[in-house]
From Swiss-Prot:
Keywords: Ribonucleoprotein, Ribosomal protein, RNA-binding, rRNA-binding, tRNA-binding. This is Small ribosomal subunit protein uS7. The lineage of its organism: Bacteria, Bacillati, Bacillota, Bacilli, Bacillales. GO terms for cellular component: cytosolic small ribosomal subunit; ribosome. It comes from Listeria monocytogenes serovar 1/2a (strain ATCC BAA-679 / EGD-e). PROSITE patterns: RIBOSOMAL_S7. Belongs to the universal ribosomal protein uS7 family. The keyword S-adenosyl-L-methionine does not apply. GO terms for molecular function: mRNA binding; rRNA binding; structural constituent of ribosome; tRNA binding. It holds the Pfam family Ribosomal_S7. Part of the 30S ribosomal subunit. Contacts proteins S9 and S11.
């Protein structure tokens, strides 16, 4: 915790092609070793693959995928009287999108397709169709929160 008060949130610029801040955040999340150009090329190629295979606007498919990935609830460990309880809490809007992007990139990297472009494209298409590993992660998170509903009164 800094002494000078809370740190201001840095705002990202929208990407040049789709004019979307969410796409910029996905590019940043995919970026490895500061290679933004490579990350952009991978994502735009993935969007081209989505457009070819679905025949729809890739931005619409991506937004639908993000809606299906972003969690509403999560559990947070809370220590009460020597015991740790998993307390379900609602997820803030900024954290929802951060978790959604993180899960999307992580599970795209774990896929078996040959190139990252295809992995990202297939993960986004799967998420838009409510299938895929990133959607399963969201469902598991919701199940954990539902299973621990009894401890919801420990919310702070």
């Amino acid at each position: 915790m800094p002494r000078k008060g809370p740190v201001a949130k840095r705002d990202v610029l929208p990407d040049p092609i789709y004019n979307s801040k969410l796409v910029t955040r996905l590019i940043n999340k995919m970026m490895v070793d500061g290679k933004r150009g490579k990350s952009q090329a991978i994502l735009y190629s993935a969007f081209d693959i989505i457009a070819q295979e679905t025949g729809k606007d890739p931005m619409e498919v991506f937004e639908q995928a993000m809606k299906n990935i972003m969690p509403l609830l999560e559990v947070k460990a809370r220590r009460v009287g020597g015991a740790n309880y998993q307390v379900p809490i609602e997820v803030r809007a900024d954290r929802r999108s951060t978790l959604g992007l993180r899960w999307l990139v992580n599970y795209a990297r774990l896929r078996g397709e040959k190139t990252m472009e295809v992995r990202v494209a297939r993960e986004i298409m799967d998420a838009a169709n409510n299938t895929g590993a990133s959607v399963k992660k969201r469902e598991d998170t919701h199940k954990m929160a539902d299973a621990n509903r009894a401890f919801a009164h420990y919310r702070w």
